[in-house]
Amino acid sequence: MQELWGVLPQCSNRYNTPAWGMPDGTPDFLNQVVMFAWDHSPAPESIMHALLEIEKELGRTRIEKNAGYVSRTMDLDLLAIEGVVWNTPELTLPHPRMHLRKFVLLPMAELARDIRATPDGPTVDELLSACPDVSSVQLWPAPGL
């Protein structure tokens, strides 16, 4: 991000989570949130395209959208831009399922507990408190390892 847009990102801790929606035996996932200041340039779609290029460089091969959840080497998502609602064929912000995913909200709350993904919406902390996801989200590596 610093290379692409000249901004130094903040990074959450990494969190270990069960392989959500995957066949038994699929290794756990590592999740992390990265946050940076956005000055309205580039456009959100340009940011998303850059993230897709990074995925590709790291060995991800994308499959059809209707294939369901599949294990992958890397998955980068543009989750939200504080106070921005964005709906285009390519990108929806905030991420339409962000509020349902503890593995997203816990690391996000670590960095930006009080931001609102939509202008009048709940804070990240409030979304986390109301999140229906009961899956295990553990700090990685676990303390004491």
Locate each region found by the language model:
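Flexible, gly/pro- and Lys/Arg-enriched active-site loops
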Residues: 20-24, 28-29, 45-145
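Short, surface-exposed acidic-centric catalytic microdomains
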Residues: 1-43, 48
